[in-house]
């Protein structure tokens, strides 16, 4: 008897707790739903979301539709669906009225249909309470004051048939959510081929943004096929950019320490090293700042129609301008070798054109950069996060990247071959006339050095050009396979990752080649003297006068002048060749 009474009290207490439970209101934190006329909501919502973070991810997929402005109360309707109104004195969440849903559907469905989308099943209107039934059912609903209270029968019948067609294709696993996940079957019929923006791309409001021939479409911030490779890409970028920065800095500082040692035709190597140093800095900024901060605009990649942020522009300027400048200086280097070997120009004669070399070396890439900015061709890379040219637009890549690099490469290699052939003929001539002289050995050594340097530079440059040609041929096919229902599906995950890794490596490894040129015992001596002079430059003069003993009869002879020069003592840090 006592046990029965205890069970009875336990059941009564449980029922009381159940009926006395009220929903808990919480402040709205979803950015899209702030400042829309109410600020309190309750969870879980009708979609089963337990937290606002979950609901926010789904409702923000409709943001492009809100930006289009097809319906003035669309934001209110979406927010009341995903973050229903919560009132402390009302036990149920307040959903939007069916009339509001129908009005939103009637005004926004035509725009969605224009791009091959249907009104999503998750926003079905038939399950929502009607404004006219609030008094009879007691189910309160939300709607702006100007919402039509009656529907046209023909319009209602049309929407009902449309939803029945949607239910025919409805998956039992649950409705797909968001514009990017709506069933993309062409409304005109399955037999008609039509290209529309769908995953893995993002629908955007701007008609200037397009992927292939599909407008209002953009690449996602991150390539969805490489979700597990972001750390690999970042670590790969860090390794090559940091090592390139170190080696290019070493080369350029060596040139500054002993400028007179490096004359034309080899001096352009150090301009090339400086350019590669700046390219490496651009990659390092991307690595330390992050992918999203550099190349992304919310959930999508920055496109050509966007106003690129300051960091994105800085990364573009460092990687594109100085990358193209390095290619121009490569052509100038090959030209100076031709002038030296084929035309027998002296270093002084070549140096007289130094100003012209600098004008071409810096103005030509500057003109290219200005044209890129004028045509708004800067965009982000969804794989590496680098702001460059042609990451999402093949036409811009072809005009501003592939064509200039191909021209610079062909001209540079042509000059290089001409100079190399002339050096070879000079070497053979010297060997025939003076086989015992050391000059032939020095020419052979110089040819070997030039040959190794040329291979170290031309191979990465050729790889970049080949990769760009591959992208020109295959990226458009992949885009078409994702956008068009009648195209055979293609995967690009592994190949796009390999392409990005090759481009990053080749753009940075060019800085290694300049380090090869200065690797010698003379360079070590120059650094040793420079380091020693840093500590002694303030305390010791560069020259120390010597006591010269001479006879009066020697003052008028030429031997006196030569003898006095030999008794002057030069300290470290002053080059032997003045």
Swiss-Prot record:
Family annotation (InterPro entries): Frizzled/SFRP, Frizzled/Smoothened_7TM, Frizzled_dom, Frizzled_dom_sf, GPCR_2-like_7TM
Compartments, record wording: Cell membrane
Biased composition regions of type Low complexity, renumbered to the chain: 160-169
A molecular function (GO) term: G protein-coupled receptor activity
Main localization category: membrane
SMART domains noted in UniProt: FRI, Frizzled
Record's compositionally biased regions (Basic residues): 150-159
Tissue expression pattern: Expressed in two pairs of head neurons and throughout the pharynx.
Function text: Receptor for Wnt proteins. Most frizzled receptors are coupled to the beta-catenin canonical signaling pathway, which leads to the activation of disheveled proteins, inhibition of gsk-3 kinase, nuclear accumulation of beta-catenin and activation of Wnt target genes. A second signaling pathway involving PKC and calcium fluxes has been seen for some family members, but it is not yet clear if it represents a distinct pathway or if it can be integrated in the canonical pathway, as PKC seems to be required for Wnt-mediated inactivation of gsk-3 kinase.
Species assigned in the record: Caenorhabditis elegans
Gene3D superfamilies hit by this protein: Frizzled cysteine-rich domain, Rhodopsin 7-helix transmembrane proteins
PANTHER family: FRIZZLED, FRIZZLED-2
Signal peptide, first to last residue: 1-17
Cysteines paired by S-S bonds: 25-86, 33-79, 70-108, 97-141, 101-125
CDD domains: 7tmF_FZD5_FZD8-like, CRD_FZ5_like
Membrane-side (Cytoplasmic) residue stretches: 258-268, 334-354, 420-449, 519-578
Sequence motif Lys-Thr-X-X-X-Trp motif, mediates interaction with the PDZ domain of Dvl family members, residues: 522-527
Membrane topology: Multi-pass membrane protein
UniProt record similarity statement: Belongs to the G-protein coupled receptor Fz/Smo family.
Keywords: Cell membrane, Developmental protein, Disulfide bond, G-protein coupled receptor, Glycoprotein, Membrane, Neurogenesis, Receptor, Signal, Transducer, Transmembrane, Transmembrane helix, Wnt signaling pathway
Short name of any one Pfam family annotated for the protein: Frizzled
Protein name per Swiss-Prot or TrEMBL: Frizzled-2
Cellular component terms per the entry's GO annotation: plasma membrane
Motif PDZ-binding per record, residues: 556-558
Keyword Cell membrane in record: yes
Inactivation phenotype: Displaced anterior nerve ring and neuronal cell migration defects including irregular localization of canal-associated neurons (CAN), hermaphrodite-specific neurons (HSN), anterior lateral microtubule neurons (ALM), and the right (but not the left) Q neuroblast (QR) and its descendants. Axon growth and guidance defects whereby some HSN, male CP neurons and CAN extend ectopic axons or branches, and furthermore some HSN irregularly route towards the ventral midline of the body.
């Amino acid at each position: 008897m006592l046990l029965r009474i205890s069970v009875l009290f336990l059941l009564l207490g449980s029922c009381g707790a159940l009926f006395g439970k009220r929903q808990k209101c919480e402040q709205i934190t979803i950015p899209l739903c702030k400042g829309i006329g109410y600020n309190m909501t309750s969870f879980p919502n009708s979609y089963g979301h337990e937290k606002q973070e979950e609901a926010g991810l789904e409702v923000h997929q409709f943001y492009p539709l809100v930006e289009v402005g097809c319906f003035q109360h669309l934001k209110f309707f979406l927010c009341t669906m995903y973050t229903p109104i919560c009132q402390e004195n009302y036990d149920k969440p307040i959903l939007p009225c069916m009339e509001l849903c129908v009005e939103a559907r009637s005004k926004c469905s035509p725009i969605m249909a224009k791009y091959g989308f249907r009104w999503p099943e998750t926003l079905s209107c038939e399950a929502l309470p009607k404004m006219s039934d609030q008094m009879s059912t007691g189910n309160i609903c939300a709607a702006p004051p100007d919402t039509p209270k009656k529907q046209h029968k023909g319009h209602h019948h049309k929407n009902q048939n449309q939803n029945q067609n949607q239910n025919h294709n409805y998956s039992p696993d649950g409705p797909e959510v968001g514009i990017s996940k709506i069933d993309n079957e062409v409304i005109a019929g399955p037999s008609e081929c039509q290209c529309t923006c769908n995953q893995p791309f993002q629908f955007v409001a701007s008609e200037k943004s397009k992927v292939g021939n599909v407008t209002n479409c953009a690449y996602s911030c991150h390539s969805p096929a490489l979700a597990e490779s972001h750390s690999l890409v970042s670590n790969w970028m860090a390794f090559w950019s940091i090592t390139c920065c170190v080696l290019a800095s070493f080369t350029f500082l060596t040139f500054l320490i002993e400028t007179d040692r490096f004359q034309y035709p080899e001096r352009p190597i150090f301009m090339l090293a400086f350019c590669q140093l700046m390219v490496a800095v651009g990659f390092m900024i991307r690595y330390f700042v992050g992918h999203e901060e550099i190349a992304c605009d919310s959930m999508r990649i920055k496109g050509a129609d966007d106003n690129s942020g300051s960091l994105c522009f800085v990364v573009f300027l460092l990687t594109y301008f100085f990358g193209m400048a390095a290619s121009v200086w490569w052509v100038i280097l090959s030209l100076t070798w031709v002038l030296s070997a084929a035309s027998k120009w002296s270093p002084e004669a070549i140096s007289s054109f130094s100003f012209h070399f600098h004008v071409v070396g810096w103005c030509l890439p500057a003109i290219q950069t200005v044209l890129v900015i004028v045509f708004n061709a800067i965009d982000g890379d969804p794989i590496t996060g680098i702001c460059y040219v042609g990451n999402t637009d093949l036409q811009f890549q072809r005009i501003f990247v592939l064509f200039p690099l191909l021209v610079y490469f062909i001209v540079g290699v042509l000059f290089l071959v001409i100079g190399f052939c002339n050096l070879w003929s000079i070497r053979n001539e010297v060997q025939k006339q003076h086989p015992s002289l050391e000059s032939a050995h020095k020419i052979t050594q110089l040819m070997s050095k030039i040959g190794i340097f040329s291979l170290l530079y031309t191979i990465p440059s050729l790889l970049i050009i080949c990769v760009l040609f591959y992208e020109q041929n295959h990226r458009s096919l992949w885009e078409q396979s994702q956008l068009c229902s009648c195209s055979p599906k293609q995967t690009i995950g592994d190949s796009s990752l390999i392409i990005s890794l090759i481009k990053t490596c080749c753009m940075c490894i060019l800085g290694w080649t300049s380090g090869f040129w200065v690797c010698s015992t003379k360079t070590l001596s120059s650094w040793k003297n420079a380091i020693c002079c840093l500590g002694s430059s303030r305390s010791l003069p560069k020259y120390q006068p010597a006591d010269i003993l001479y006879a009066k009869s020697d003052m008028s002879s030429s031997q006196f002048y030569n003898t006095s020069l030999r008794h002057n003592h030069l300290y470290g840090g002053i080059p032997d060749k003045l």
